[in-house]
Amino acid sequence: MASSSRFAALLLLALPALALPPSQVVPRAACATPSTVPGYNNDRLPDPFLFDDGTAVTSSADWDCRRSQIAAVVQGYEAGYLPPQPPIVSATFSSSDGTGTLTVTAGLSSDNTISFSEPITYPSGTAPAAGWPLVIAYDVLSIPVPDGIAVMVYNNDDIAQENDLSSRGVGLFYDLYGTDATASAMTAWVWGVSRIIDALETTPAANINTAKIAVTGCSRDGKGALMAGAFEPRVALTIPQESGSGGDTCWRLSKYEQDSGDVVQQATEIVTENVWFSTNFDNYVNNLSVLPYDHHELAAMVAPRPLLSYENTEYEWLSPLSAYGCMSAAHTVYEALGIPDYHGFVQVGNHSHCYFPDTLDDSLYAFFDRFLLDEDDVSTDYFTTNYQFNGTVWNASYWINWTTPQLD
């Protein structure tokens, strides 16, 4: 089955790119945002400081437009269409003994609605005047959270199922938008996070400061958390943990690792495993050079908001060189914006997958303290790796072959 899927993908490469209809490109800025870039071909990491037409990004206002372009092509090639807020969004809230339940109803019409409920665990004590900061954890909380921050465990599988390829089109999102919606499971999860924030903004009883929301998750849920931070601008802090292929690694770099003899997950395999990407991505996994973006630009979409990624070199499958190289490339955007300490990356080994060793607490708590708890005197200058890349050589000047501008 996997071989036939790859053969079909090779045939489909001869077809024109499957662009989203103009009405289905999310409008995010007053600039051209095509969902495909015909004729693009680049074996190295694409320059994030070039617009689709090849002109240079020279200001922070330009970056806003460039971010919108990246959002459009990520949807067009791999993620599928992310719908905007539907016309119906409402919420109810109940609480008891330090916990609460937020029930969100979203719909396209009065006879086409869905509802889902998410639990919130609150800190002890008196809430700040603006409400509690909140961490939204995909599926399960796998990192420590300091005192003074509420936690919601997001049941993202209810929104879009992800058991295997048979999960395509299964979940509440598809009950609303149809089983033929192009959105991948991860895109549907982003939509769910956005509806949760919509609901919290109009539910004062929940007592959440919606300007101080973080998202996190590990492994497949780390991929989802990065997507949420990239596409939902109301997320104040994004913390993907060991997201590996399809997360904070780059497709081109993971292929380079595989070609170097490393046993890593890369694009041709991941599309046969689950429904994290749209079916359209199958058309490109054997010809990655035609992608006018890579995941350094997905991560850079979070900018200028803070991003903290954790990776684990204990697991070759997670593409350790790809993660470091990809986030190094994303880091150039934060440098260009004059906020390099808004982007953290910590890569260590010697621990189990999704286990969070206490040696990482300092970096994590620094980002929480500074960006959710408003402690201004905290340093968030963390960008480190142990360079355990299984003997594969990282050549920064080859892969990151652009000059980082200063964006005023």
UniProtKB/Swiss-Prot annotation:
Motif GXSYXG catalytic site motif: chain residues: 217-222
Active site residues according to the UniProt entry: S219 (nucleophile), H353 (proton donor/acceptor)
GO biological process assignments: lignin catabolic process
Molecular functions per Gene Ontology: carboxylic ester hydrolase activity
Disulfide bonds: C31-C65, C218-C354, C250-C326
Enzyme Commission code: 3.1.1.117
Gene3D superfamilies from the UniProt entry: alpha/beta hydrolase
Signal peptide (residue range): 1-19
Binding site for substrate: K223, Q265, E273, W317
Residues carrying covalently attached carbohydrate according to the record: N287, N350, N390, N395, N401
Listed GO CC annotations: extracellular region
InterPro entries: AB_hydrolase_fold (IPR029058), GCE-like_dom (IPR054579)
Keywords: Disulfide bond, Glycoprotein, Hydrolase, Lignin degradation, Secreted, Serine esterase, Signal
Main location: secreted
Catalytic activities: a 4-O-methyl-alpha-D-glucuronosyl ester derivative + H2O = 4-O-methyl-alpha-D-glucuronate derivative + an alcohol + H(+)
Subcellular location: Secreted
Function: Glucuronoyl esterase which may play a significant role in biomass degradation, as it is considered to disconnect hemicellulose from lignin through the hydrolysis of the ester bond between 4-O-methyl-D-glucuronic acid residues of glucuronoxylans and aromatic alcohols of lignin. Can hydrolyze benzyl glucuronic acid (BnGlcA), allyl glucuronic acid (allylGlcA) and to a lower degree methyl glucuronic acid (MeGlcA) in vitro.
Protein family according to the UniProt entry: Belongs to the carbohydrate esterase 15 (CE15) family.
Protein name as annotated: 4-O-methyl-glucuronoyl methylesterase 1
